[in-house]
Amino acid sequence: TVDEVADMCLDLQQQGALNVNFVTPTHYSPHIRAAVAHARARGLALPVVWNTSGYETVRAVRDNVGTVDVYLTDFKYCSSSLARRYSAAPDYPEVAMAALEEMARCVGAPEGDEVDGQPRLTRGVVVRHLMLPGALEDSKRVVRTIWERFGNDVLLSLMNQYTPVLADA
C-alpha cells in the first residue's frame, strides 16, 4: 500500500540510506508519488532516485516534479536500427532524448552533499550507457550527443561490463 511504501522510505532513512531508489517504477508512478508525499510529510529528507530505462514519456517525467530529485536513466542507443534490433523499439533514441531533456529541465544541474564522508547526489541526472560489443561507433555518438546537448548539466556513466556468453561455451 501507499502507507507501507512510505514506511519503507522512512525505515531506509532511519537505517542510514543515502537515498530512496525506485527501480523501473513508471508503472507505479501515481502510488510512488503519493507514498513519497506521505513520507516527506512525516520527515523523509532523503533524495528520491528514479532508476529508469529512459524509455519514458515527457508527460510521465513532468508528473514526477516535486517527487523525484535524481534521475538515473539509461541512454542505450542513438541508432534506431540498434534500438529495433535489441529493444524492439526503433523510436527509442527520440523518446529517450525527449525524456532526458525533460528530466534535465525538471531537476536541474547536479548538486550533492556529503554524508559521513560519502559523497551523495541530491539533485540532477545521471545518464548510464552500456557499451555493446560491435557498437563502438554508436557509443561514441551517444557520448557526443549527450555532451553537445547537456555539457556538464548531466553526469555520464559509461559501462562496459556486457559479456556475451555463447550457448555452446
Protein language model features and the residues they cover:
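Conserved AdoMet/S-adenosylmethionine-binding subsite of the radical SAM
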Residues: 3-168
